[in-house]
Amino acid sequence: MSDDDCDIFSAARKRIPEIALPKNPYNLGNDSFSKEVDYDFIEDLPKKSTKTGKRKNPAATRKNPPKSQDDASPPKQAEHKAVEPEEDMRTERSLSPVSLLILEMEKKNGQQSDVEKHAKENDVGPVARRTRSSLNRSEMAPPPVSPTVEVPTQTKPKKRGQKKRTSLTTTTSNSASMEVSLPSIVGQNNEHISRRWTLAEVAARSKVVDSIDLVSAVAPRVEGFVNLDSEDEGEKEAPPVVEEENIFDNDNPTIEVALSWLGEIQIYKLRQHQKFKHLFKELASRNGIDENDITVDMYYNFVGPEDTPHSIGLKSFHTLTGHPTKSHNNNNVAAKIDYNPEALCRKPKKFQVKVQADKWKHPLVIPMKKTDNFKIIFIKCAEELNCDPRTIKLFFDGDLLDPNDTPNNQDMEGNEVIDLKIKA
């Protein structure tokens, strides 16, 4: 073994590091822990890894706390306070409905004050009070209308189990419309005032053509009016007389009477209280026979000339039968006259009244019920006189009788005499 082999200076000597507790906490940026072996004279260059890894951000350096006593808050709070105003400037916070209403009220008050101020400055008097000093007064333009933009609010996504919240878009749209309408109204008033002002200026500067004296001038005649003092106007035509409603038509209607004459059905018209003597005349003239040679019966009951459809109970479905005869039975009138002296003195079996008038010699006997209206007397007297029942007046003991009144209300017992008068 030679001395060269045992030379201690020719070989690298490895020193064992001393194991000691680390004073500082473990940090990835500190390379003292990565190198556990220390060589004095050999420096090995670290090899670069081919793998690409995520680059780690360097740790933020911690600033020293302030030495002054005024700023006693920690650095993190200070940083947070400095950043807050930047966030407020970037993001706009939505207002609550109450704050929106307050903002609208403040805007309205401000606009009203501006309008009042503008009206005071541009106060234009009426045309009658204007003087020459007011000619040079310039009218101010209406205040500019600030455009309002409707800002829609962002609505959050709906979640289940939550109640619906009212959106603020409706309130903002209403406020915007109110703000726009108020200046438009003010602008219209100003335009109206300016138009009046220009018309007054034109009238004041125009030439005077003529003048009218309203005190001594004669009033012109107006067409379409009637002069009450003039005699030229013709008398107005009297209005047409409206015919009075006939209250007797319902109690005396016209019916059709069917009569079989030698197998031929003939139709005649009679009123309920009209006597059959009118039918006998029409039947005789139609068939060429004498009136006294006619016999009429209803189901084998003879019908006389003094009977009426109401007295025999004739209806529209009944049919009468007529025969030509030469017995001349109709000439025996004395047997059927009711106003002979014996018949008038005899006590009647039924209730009846007597009507006396200048038109006939003997009173007219009319049988009726106590509960019937006096309309029957009016109608029968009109049929006897062949006139309108509205022209007849009836009096009992000097009192005028109402057609709707009844004998029972007048305390009649029978055979009372009623006076008849005809209207002039």
From Swiss-Prot:
Its main location: nucleus. This is DNA repair protein Rad60. Residues 48-57, 156-166 have a biased composition (Basic residues). Required for repair of DNA double strand breaks which occur during replication or are induced by ionizing radiation (IR). Functions with dgrn and downstream of the SMC5-SMC6 complex to regulate strand break repair. Likely functions by stabilizing the association of heterochromatic double strand breaks (DSBs) with the nuclear periphery as part of the homologous recombination (HR) repair process. The modification Phosphotyrosine is found at residue 26. Transmembrane segments: none annotated. InterPro entries: NFATC2-Int_DNA_Repair, Rad60/SUMO-like_dom, Ubiquitin-like_domsf. Residues 77-93, 104-123 have a biased composition (Basic and acidic residues). CDD domains: Ubl_SUMO_like. Residues 167-177 have a biased composition (Low complexity). One of its GO terms (biological process) is double-strand break repair via homologous recombination. It comes from Drosophila melanogaster (Fruit fly). The modification Phosphoserine is found at residues 32, 34, 96. It is found in: Nucleus; Nucleus, Nucleoplasm. Disruption phenotype: Larval neuroblasts exhibit significant genome instability, including increased aneuploidy, chromosome fusions and satellite repeats. Coiled coil: none annotated. Forms a complex with dgrn; likely required for localization to the nuclear periphery. Interacts with the SMC5-SMC6 complex members SMC5 and SMC6/jnj following ionizing radiation (IR) to induce DNA damage. Interaction between the SMC5-SMC6 complex and the dgrn-Rad60 complex, may stabilize the association of heterochromatic DSBs with the nuclear periphery. The keyword Nucleus applies. Residues 45-177 are annotated as: Disordered. Keywords: Nucleus, Phosphoprotein. GO terms for cellular component: nuclear periphery; nucleoplasm.
